[in-house]
Amino acid sequence: MTTLSIYHRPHITQPIQQLTAFNDIASLLASAGIQLEHWQAEAPPLNASSETILTQYHADIERLKQQEGYTSADVISLTPNHAERKALREKFLQEHTHSEDEVRFFVRGSGAFFVPIGEQVFQLTCEAGDLLRVPANTPHWFDCGEFPDFVAIRIFTNPEGWVGHFTGRETFH
């Protein structure tokens, strides 16, 4: 289930608000400039190639490309037995920005995006079918969990713009 928990810094042990209704979550995020959509997700076979997954969602990807000017897409897949899962998680957990929008569509599995907005931190747990667009230059971090198990499509304007610029600020998960 897609959920949004809102924390107030520095008291991050207990959320001050939790939402589970998708439309309420999308509306609140939109007020902060963050886009959340739900696409129909059909889990691909476990060993599906990136090409197979991109073909499966071609029409939706092309619609976004035309609407927003994105030019390319790829697939990221992390599993509990991925050789670099610990290092990747540590990297994702560092607050960073990108010089372009961060667009992710969860094909399978889930993960949590954290976006600090003023004195609050939004924790959005995305699941299969969720498309998230975090605007360019917005600080955020991502927790895929100790044993990540997700497949997501990443959509870019320029793959070089996806490179993270780390802020060095403290995060939590």
UniProtKB/Swiss-Prot annotation:
State how the cofactor is bound: Binds 1 Fe(2+) cation per monomer.
Q: Where along the sequence does the record put site: May play a role in metal incorporation in vivo?
A: E95
Q: Which Gene3D superfamilies match?
A: Jelly Rolls
Annotated site (Important to generate the dianion), which positions? R104
* The protein's annotated pathway: Amino-acid biosynthesis; L-methionine biosynthesis via salvage pathway; L-methionine from S-methyl-5-thio-alpha-D-ribose 1-phosphate: step 5/6
Q: Which residues bind Fe(2+)?
A: H96, H98, E102, H140
Q: How does it assemble?
A: Monomer.
What is the name of this protein?
Acireductone dioxygenase 1
Name its species: Pectobacterium atrosepticum (strain SCRI 1043 / ATCC BAA-672) (Erwinia carotovora subsp. atroseptica)
Its gene name is mtnD1
